[in-house]
């Protein structure tokens, strides 16, 4: 991710580099989300959004449309790194769309941090990046182990 990029470039004192060196796995958050019946699938973003969402979609026999403008980008980073970088220890989950607002409010109340809805699950079998409501042809992939 962006923190590793900073470290490799010799920028060791940036907030992104510090976050990379001192990850905070979201165990309590994962346990809480995993107990919610409106949450359908979940995993950490160790290999990046593009790769890890692909794993969820493959196992779920589903597709997704991801709104590029809704992906959170850390200060000092960029959209491609946010979508393809890994080792973030954040959680990626899918939930019932009719429960999303209530789930986000309950998460914020419990953990003091927001949930970022970035798209929707579709009946198709592909990941489609969207910009301004239109498909954006991007060949973005996260980390692959082999």
Task: Locate predicted features.
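Glycine-/charge-enriched secondary-structure boundary and capping motifs
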Residues: 12-15, 35-146
């Amino acid at each position: 991710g962006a923190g590793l990029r900073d470290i490799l470039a010799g920028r060791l004192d940036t907030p992104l580099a510090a976050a990379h060196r001192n990850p905070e796995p979201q165990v309590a958050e994962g346990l809480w989300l995993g107990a919610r019946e409106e949450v359908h699938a979940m995993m950490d973003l160790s290999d990046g959004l593009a790769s890890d969402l692909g794993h969820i979609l493959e196992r779920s026999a589903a597709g997704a449309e991801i709104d590029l403008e809704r992906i959170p980008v850390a200060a000092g980073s960029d959209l491609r790194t946010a979508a393809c970088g890994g080792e973030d220890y954040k959680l990626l989950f899918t939930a019932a769309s009719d429960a999303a607002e209530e789930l986000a409010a309950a998460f914020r109340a419990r953990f003091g941090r927001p949930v970022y809805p970035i798209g929707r699950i579709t009946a198709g079998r592909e990941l489609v990046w969207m910009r301004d409501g239109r498909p954006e042809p991007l060949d973005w992939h996260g980390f692959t182990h082999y």
